[in-house]
């Protein structure tokens, strides 16, 4: 039995995700597809537009056999930690291969970049320092240093974006690899695989359609998640029917999941953020909240802002939108740096929580129970009896975050979904 794993957000599930899932099965010849999906919050430091149970159902309807949850401590982490959790979890449950999308589409090129970043040469470190001293952001300086140190004889074959048969001795081509979000995440998967000595095979496919951050329908066949979220937000403000909106832009196979769907947006958390800022102290040890950002947050005079407005007010050249958004979300959730450090030190993947699975895929569950090296949670009410204290704390952080999400969601007309009583999603 061969199992392929996909590390995802599905925010929301769109045509590009369906293509990814289909190609992953074909490329690996896998018998089963396991999806590891962010829960209530995503890496950008925002709430998922739809709840985790709805998004689980869309994945299963599209062909996934099993959906597991990335807990909020790592679903809202940096690319490095997000990737490390995904690789650790899929390795721990016995997945054989991982397939991810990338702008590059060439696994060997991404492996070379990953190796270079895991084994930084003295020249790389010096060029990185020079870039930072010159005023570049860390991602910009890192991309430039990679380009300047990796340029040389490797060739990229049959990659449209990199021009087939282009000699990548050109440093700009190497730099561009680290300027593309899916390449960056793919490189982090490969770095984590080396660090964790993962036995899994890794494959990449060229990302189809609009770019990750494209917020318009540049490609009607493969619109980006960002564009779809924008359409939903803008259309709802004009009192358009949600199901009509979704039917035009999401795979038909997933449409049944959206009956009664209630979208959630980052500004729905504005009240919680304002209340937290009012009572916070600059000495809080909150994940991703630097002393500089904490000081700016607490500097008088206080004025209530929407979540989006506060991000815009705080971001700088060095503090990107996503970095600020992630820090503010961690502040609202009370997510402490010391807790995340402990969970990382203990191996990231302390349990595997099932969100849903296909009934016809029961042999997969039997296989995972045999191959799995960490507790497998199928019933939340029983989790406390099977988890070590640290693992239970990781799960309880997810429960707290999801209940906050649900509290906000019911204000938009949703039904509260309790983490301890909500059943698994079956298809």
Predicted regions and their residues:
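Non-catalytic positions within long, well-ordered alpha-helices that form the structural scaffold/packing
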Residues: 25-26, 60, 87-91
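A glycine-rich helix N-cap at a beta->alpha junction
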Residues: 57-71
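Short, solvent-exposed amphipathic alpha-helices that sit
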Residues: 54-58, 189
């Amino acid at each position: 039995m061969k199992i392929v794993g996909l590390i995802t957000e599905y925010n929301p599930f769109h045509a590009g995700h369906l293509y990814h899932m289909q190609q992953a099965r074909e490329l690996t010849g896998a018998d089963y597809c396991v999806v590891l999906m962010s829960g209530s919050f995503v890496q950008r430091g925002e709430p998922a537009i739809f709840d985790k149970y709805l998004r689980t159902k869309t994945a299963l309807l599209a062909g996934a056999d099993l959906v597991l949850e990335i807990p909020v401590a790592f679903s809202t982490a940096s690319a490095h930690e997000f990737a490390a959790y995904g690789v650790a979890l899929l390795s721990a449950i016995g997945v054989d291969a991982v397939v991810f999308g990338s702008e590059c589409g060439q696994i060997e090129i991404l492996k070379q970049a990953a190796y270079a970043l895991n084994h930084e040469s003295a020249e790389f470190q010096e060029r990185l320092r020079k870039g930072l001293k010159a005023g570049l952001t860390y991602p910009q300086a890192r991309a430039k240093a990679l380009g300047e140190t990796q340029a040389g004889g490797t060739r990229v074959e049959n990659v449209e974006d990199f021009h087939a048969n282009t000699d990548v001795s050109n440093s700009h081509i190497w730099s561009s690899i680290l300027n593309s979000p899916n390449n960056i995440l793919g490189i982090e998967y490969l770095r984590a695989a080396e660090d964790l000595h993962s036995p899994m095979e890794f494959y990449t496919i060229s990302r189809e359609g609009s770019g990750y951050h494209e917020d318009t329908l540049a490609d009607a066949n493969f619109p980006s998640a960002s564009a779809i979220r924008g359409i939903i937000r803008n259309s709802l403000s004009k009192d358009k029917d949600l199901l009509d909106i979704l039917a035009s832009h999401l795979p038909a196979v997933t449409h049944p999941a959206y009956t009664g769907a209630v979208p959630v947006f980052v500004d729905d958390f504005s009240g919680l953020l304002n209340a937290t800022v009012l009572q916070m102290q600059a000495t809080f040890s909150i994940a991703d909240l630097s002393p500089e950002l904490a000081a700016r947050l607490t500097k008088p005079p206080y004025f209530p802002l929407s979540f989006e407005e506060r991000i815009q007010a705080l971001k700088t050249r060095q503090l990107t939108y996503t970095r600020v958004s992630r820090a503010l979300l961690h502040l609202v959730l009370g997510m402490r740096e010391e807790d995340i450090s402990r969970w990382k030190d203990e191996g990231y993947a302390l349990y595997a929580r099932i969100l849903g699975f296909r009934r016809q895929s029961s042999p997969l569950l039997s296989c995972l129970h045999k191959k799995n090296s960490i507790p497998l949670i199928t019933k939340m009410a029983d989790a406390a009896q099977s988890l070590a204290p640290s693992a239970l704390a990781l799960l309880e952080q997810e429960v707290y975050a999801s209940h906050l999400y649900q509290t906000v969601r019911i204000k938009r007309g949703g039904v509260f979904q309790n983490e301890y009583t909500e059943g698994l999603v079956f298809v």
